[in-house]
Amino acid sequence: MKLSMPRFDQAPVLVVGDVMLDRYWHGGTSRISPEAPVPVVKVDQIEDRPGGAANVALNIAALGAPASLIGVTGQDEAADSLANSLQAAGVRSVFQRIAHQPTIVKLRVMSRHQQLLRIDFEEPFATDPLSLGAEVDSLLEGVKVLVLSDYGKGALKNHQNLIQAARAKGIPVLADPKGKDFSIYRGASLITPNLSEFETIVGRCVDEAELVAKGLQLLQDLDLGALLVTRGEHGMTLLRVGQPALHLPARAREVFDVTGAGDTVISTLAAAIAAGEDLPHAVALANLAAGIVVGKLGTAAISAPELRRAIQREEGSERGVLGLEQLLLAIDDARAHNEKIVFTNGCFDILHAGHVTYLEQARAQGDRLIVAVNDDASVSRLKGPGRPINSVDRRMAVLAGLGAVDWVISFPEGTPENLLSQVKPDVLVKGGDYGIDQVVGADIVKGYGGTVKVLGLVENSSTTAIVEKIRKN
């Protein structure tokens, strides 16, 4: 399956469910308490992150999709912290604030990236929460996917009303289920239980075949569009009536913390489906996203640049010959990772040792090296009849095979000013013995605060000399 990055900016999603605040106390631990055999943590940092349904909405917004959230909180500082964090992330949130009801807070005491203790602050909701009929109908307008983020905390008690309201508008409903009764999700487009939650409903599955059989039966019993079972280190299994099971292996290189991994799965699914992706593609993207987020500490979101880079790595397109649109996206991702972009250009007709040394020196000026190559017509204008010896496709293929080179692109003009104006590299590098002001494009790069560097050429290394030697012999 070929993966590509969806247009998340045109994919509005509404999340309804249990919101909570994930609070972290970070500090050092160097002694045992004299009062009891427990470590003493000297707290030096307090960190708040949106959790539960709020983390789902945050993940959707981090991918660049418009995200709205409906939830229940208390009237306290934890609710204020949640609202401020979500507003800063661009999430439109509507909270039903209940007096004398604490906002759900999960407090984790951390030392040296290890969780020592978790303390939960929560009480059952005394009222009938989320009786927000008018608000839900209003927020459903223009929405392409509805997510029910159910943590079993009591905020969601009207699942069927929400599912039917969305279905009446033709809006897919995705649910992250909890509890021992999945019938409350009847008619949903997709539910995403983990293996433990799934087996709570259908019983233990001794093998994959039994999982598939029981999953297909559950689909029919509950009139579900699809079922995605997340299986930890065994990946994910997507089941649909009348379709073969789709098994995807886990993508995590190293599992550091699984907190919020389920939120990442359903948020990526929702954003991808809202962007028009088919379900198998959306599941593959969610699987890739989950593999990234479990390598982070605590409740965390995956950004669009992180997902795009993972897709490029998966498709083998993280490096190599790119078109302008692909190159600009790759540059955006690199800058999101604080990488310095270096640019150089030339004909590179017959690649020789001098070129290789020069390109290695150029790459050393930053983190990513772009090599812009004159196309065949411009080389002929610059070098005269009989040149180039090698076509532009072959020249770019050879350059792309060098370890020092990240991206290769061609340009039709004699000089690269037009390309420089669009790429805006941090460093422009040229080989030769002339001054910086003589470098073509130096004025453009210096104009936006970039750097221009001139590197010396390797002696007795020249494509022209090689061509003349071949002709004489």
Curated annotation (Swiss-Prot):
Tell me the residue numbers annotated for binding ATP.
N194, L195, S196, E197
Enzyme Commission number(s) from the entry: 2.7.1.167, 2.7.7.70
Q: What are the alphabetically sorted keywords of the record?
A: ATP-binding, Carbohydrate metabolism, Kinase, Multifunctional enzyme, Nucleotide-binding, Nucleotidyltransferase, Transferase
The region called Ribokinase is annotated at: 1-318
CDD domains for this protein: RfaE_like
Note the Pfam families from the entry.
CTP_transf_like, PfkB
Q: Where is the active site?
A: D263
Q: Which GO terms describe its biological process?
A: ADP-L-glycero-beta-D-manno-heptose biosynthetic process
Catalyzed reaction equations: D-glycero-beta-D-manno-heptose 7-phosphate + ATP = D-glycero-beta-D-manno-heptose 1,7-bisphosphate + ADP + H(+); D-glycero-beta-D-manno-heptose 1-phosphate + ATP + H(+) = ADP-D-glycero-beta-D-manno-heptose + diphosphate
Is rRNA processing given among the entry's keywords?
no
Q: In which pathway does it act?
A: Nucleotide-sugar biosynthesis; ADP-L-glycero-beta-D-manno-heptose biosynthesis; ADP-L-glycero-beta-D-manno-heptose from D-glycero-beta-D-manno-heptose 7-phosphate: step 1/4; Nucleotide-sugar biosynthesis; ADP-L-glycero-beta-D-manno-heptose biosynthesis; ADP-L-glycero-beta-D-manno-heptose from D-glycero-beta-D-manno-heptose 7-phosphate: step 3/4
Query: Which PANTHER family does the protein's record reference?
Result: BIFUNCTIONAL PROTEIN HLDE
* Subunit note: Homodimer.
Q: Per the similarity annotation, which family is this?
A: In the N-terminal section; belongs to the carbohydrate kinase PfkB family. In the C-terminal section; belongs to the cytidylyltransferase family.
Q: What protein does this entry describe?
A: Bifunctional protein HldE
Source organism phylogeny: Bacteria, Pseudomonadati, Pseudomonadota, Gammaproteobacteria, Pseudomonadales
Which gene is annotated as encoding this protein in its UniProt record?
A: hldE
